[in-house]
Regions:
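Compositionally biased low-complexity segments at domain edges in trafficked proteins
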Residues: 80-155, 169
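Extracellular interdomain linker/stem segments of modular secreted and single-pass surface proteins
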Residues: 74-79
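A structural detector for beta-sheet-dominated domains
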Residues: 2-8, 15-19, 71-73, 102-104, ...
Length: 170
């Protein structure tokens, strides 16, 4: 993700250019699952639960920029405002205060509210979910980490060798 704009449930607008680092999730290969979650971020926080999220992202496998608009449904926002029946690792009241977004080939996007402790994540079906690319880009036109073309680094060439595109069930 190269840029994100968030309008929270309190109608405060946020813009994020310095995005939280997301470590590789080795257990998320070929399909989504409800257990994996990235460690909590440090920079991309909002005062109230997010309502509308717009973000720009590069798909190296697709060799293109995507622009995704999503709106969380009221039920997800309500869940994030209430405390969980589960406690956090310190034994204190915990809240569903973290949203995780999965990105996959062909511009596919999935959303979860992170579970508490060993509880599985909660899949969210957005009220609005629209992903565009190419000449349909509005805000994300020219926003990329790959201005000189998409190249594969590290273990990626070996990982994708002999796989059929799009790889996996997303």
């Amino acid at each position: 993700v190269t840029f994100a704009a968030v309008l929270d449930a309190g109608n405060i607008d946020y813009r994020f250019n310095t995005l939280d680092y997301t470590p590789a999730l080795d257990s998320v290969v070929g399909e989504w699952n409800e257990r994996s979650r990235a460690a909590n971020g440090h920079w991309n926080r909002t005062k109230s639960p997010p309502r509308h999220i717009l973000f720009c992202w590069d798909s190296v496998i697709d060799k293109k920029v995507y622009e995704t608009h999503l709106t969380l449904p009221d039920a997800a926002i309500d869940k994030m405002r209430r405390s969980s029946m589960y406690k956090n690792y310190l034994g204190k009241t915990a809240y569903y205060d973290s949203v995780q977004i999965g990105l996959a080939p062909e511009g596919k996007v999935a959303v979860w509210i992170d579970g508490i402790g060993f509880e599985p994540n909660h899949r969210v079906i957005p009220a609005v979910l629209k992903t565009v690319s190419g000449d349909k880009l509005a805000l994300c036109k020219g926003i990329t980490k790959h201005p000189n073309g998409y190249k594969y680094y590290g273990d990626t060439p070996e990982f994708i060798k002999n796989k059929v595109y799009p790889y996996g069930v997303w």
